[in-house]
A protein has these predicted regions:
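Short glycine-rich, low-complexity segments
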Residues: 1-29, 39, 45-70
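Structural detector for short beta-strands of small beta-barrel domains
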Residues: 30-34
């Protein structure tokens, strides 16, 4: 995903309070709501870790969170 596209999607998810799933280039993943948007990073309230900053440059996959269906 290009940077401009990612910023638009992030802004949409932030504004609409959509729960997101983020995979990072360093192998971590996060599920939660975006609390804050800054110039180079966001703060997500991860379901397990609580408030966590994530650099935009470290985001590999950004998508709407979906519950597992068994």
């Amino acid at each position: 995903m290009k940077v401009d596209e990612m910023n638009e999607v992030l802004e949409f998810f932030f504004t609409k309070k959509v729960t997101v799933h983020i995979d990072t280039k360093s192998g971590e993943w996060y599920n939660g709501l975006i609390l804050e948007m800054h110039e180079k990073f966001l703060v997500i309230h991860d379901r397990v870790l609580g408030e966590t900053p994530i650099l935009f440059s470290n985001i590999k996959i950004l998508e709407k969170y979906r519950e597992k269906v068994e």
